[in-house]
Amino acid sequence: MGNVYTKDIKRVAMQLYEKFKDQISTDYQANKKIVDAYVDVMSKKVRNRIAGYLTRYAKMQRTQVKNEVEEEYIEGEG
């Protein structure tokens, strides 16, 4: 079964990604440190969920950008 994240976790992760896009990576451990540094989270569980969704969101965004670049390249050849 997949993970279901609350809107709050998604919102915080997306805001972090937009603000610190250059620092966010697809590495979960690095993203945990970023969440610790920039978000005042009371529990470790919430921090980990934000970092996990942030990692997943970063992977999705990078894949989407990569696909767009490939499509532009293919259209340019034709």
Swiss-Prot record:
GO CC annotation terms, alphabetical: cytosol; ribonucleoprotein complex; ribosome
Record keywords: Ribonucleoprotein, Ribosomal protein
GO MF term list: structural constituent of ribosome
SUPFAM superfamilies registered for this protein in UniProt: Rps17e-like
Source species, domain of life: Archaea
InterPro entries xref list: Ribosomal_eS17 (IPR001210), Ribosomal_eS17_CS (IPR018273), Ribosomal_eS17_sf (IPR036401)
GO biological process: translation
Matching HAMAP family: Ribosomal_eS17
Entry similarity comment: Belongs to the eukaryotic ribosomal protein eS17 family.
Name of protein: Small ribosomal subunit protein eS17
Name of the coding gene: rps17e
